C-alpha cells in the first residue's frame, strides 16, 4: 500500500490539471498559431510558464485505485497487475478470462 500522502498528492495534481486545462489549451493554441505576432506568442509562452507545474497533465502518475501502486497499472481497469490477477481469478471482472492457447 502506498503512503496516503502520495495518493493525496496525485489527487491534488488531478484537480489542478482539471482547473487549468482550459487556460493551458488557450495559451498553447496561441503559441502554435503562426498568424499571431511574435510578441503575442511570446507573452502567451510567459503566461504558460507562470502556471503551476502541477497544472501540466504530464506530471500525473497513474496509480492503482486499490493499493496506490504507481507501476504496473493498467489504464483500462485502473488497477495494478497483481490486483487484476487476484480479482480476475475470483471472476469479478466481466469478460476477462485467463489466456490459453
Curated annotation (Swiss-Prot):
Q: Which domain of life is it from?
A: Bacteria
InterPro entries noted in UniProt: Ribosomal_uS14, Ribosomal_uS14_bac/plastid
Name the UniProt record assigns to this protein = Small ribosomal subunit protein uS14
**Gene assigned in the entry:** rpsN
Q: Which GO terms describe its molecular function?
A: rRNA binding; structural constituent of ribosome
Q: Which NCBIfam families match?
A: PRK08881.1
Gene3D superfamilies xref list: 1.10.287.1480
Q: How does it assemble?
A: Part of the 30S ribosomal subunit. Contacts proteins S3 and S10.
Keyword Ribosomal protein (UniProt): yes
Keyword annotations from UniProtKB, A to Z = Ribonucleoprotein, Ribosomal protein, RNA-binding, rRNA-binding
The Gene Ontology biological process annotation of the record reads:
translation
A cellular component term, taken from the record's GO annotations: small ribosomal subunit
Please verify whether the record's keywords include Repressor: no
